[in-house]
Amino acid sequence: MHHMWYESNMIDECWHSILQALRSAPDAKVKIKICFNYQTYVEEPTVSSPKRLLEKWDSHPLMQDYSPELTIKDNNDPFYNIADWRREVYDPEAKYTVWGESDTIIPRDFFAILNMVEIDQPHVLTFAGRPMWDNSWDVVTHERLLGYDKPCQCKPHKDDCIELLESPWKYKDYITQKELDKFNDESGDINIKSVPHKIDGSLVCISSGHKTPFIAPGMHFVREDTCFEYVCRKRNIPQVCVTSRLKGHNYWHPTKRVGTDASRNDEVFKKYAAESQAAMSEFLQNLDK
């Protein structure tokens, strides 16, 4: 897990979700790695000590009971963000290297499923999502939520048209762990199927044996999941999806950012994002299988 200081208010929810899944799979061998990122290159703080926003979680049960490997990044280091972390943390010998995000909670049986799955080739495993902004995401949408997602036909296009859908859960809805567990408990047996490549970085399980790098060396953040998806396509790495288990990616989390007024519309953010996307384009153009 890579946590920025301004994501602090989501950590308790995220970590308790991981704890629940760990305790539900006592036989699974899980090594937890966490990066606390205190850098302020992009987001200017409105609080006196961004560091304290993350340090307060040192006594959390996840820290105390499972002793994660902790990495610290601050302004004494060059610019470092989630794409750097994901590029560096991959373990080609581990059964799975899992990407998570601060705004995402996981199914109770997440680690039990990973412990159970046996696929004898490099692959990527994902968990089902909610209806997104267009039908291209249907291939990785939970099987009980299909049939609701329709692209906007308005002219001009309206980004919020999905609000009109009748789906019980949409990508903009905030879902709690209790609600996620109830939905998944009612979803029956584990169904895993091969799907066309469609990856979002909120919860991705990357098997052993992948050729690296699969994220452009010059990428720091923004679209590293897209870069990985394109690499999988080019290298014919299959994707499978647990279509009967919903992940809880709270894209519009009510406490997404604390201690800063910065947003993705800031010029500094756009500058770093453009650099990362340029690095991705160059990397993919020169990629061989």
Model-predicted segments: where are they?
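Short, acidic, metal-binding catalytic loop of nucleotide-sugar glycosyltransferases
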Residues: 13-29, 41, 56-61
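Short beta-strand-to-loop acidic/aromatic patch adjacent to the donor-nucleotide binding site
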Residues: 94-105
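Conserved catalytic core of nucleotide-sugar-dependent glycosyltransferases
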Residues: 107-216
